[in-house]
């Protein structure tokens, strides 16, 4: 995994992870991706908003990339009830929410998001 620390011994890397982390956000930025986000699943509304924004930009402006941290409770032997606790800790330590938005994508999102939302009719 590109998010696993160098040297970490895991089932998928029994001798320790030999490669350094890949700066996927940096690669996306250099590649000119229009909407880039990093997030952990600690805030469901933010996850939904981020995915919605990425899809809208991909449909109308250009490429989107989301890097989402998910606790691998099997690989790291995290008990299922502690998965969200792990996600909050990782988010605080090194995986805070970040968005990188191109000027074209920002203009599009500003325009779309200022429109009044349609109400569902019963």
Identify the residue ranges that each predicted region occupies.
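Acidic, Ser/Thr-rich peripheral helices and adjacent loops at domain boundaries
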Residues: 2-22, 83-100
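Conserved thiamine diphosphate
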Residues: 7-57
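Glycine/aspartate-rich loop-and-adjacent alpha/beta segment that forms the canonical ThDP
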Residues: 50-122
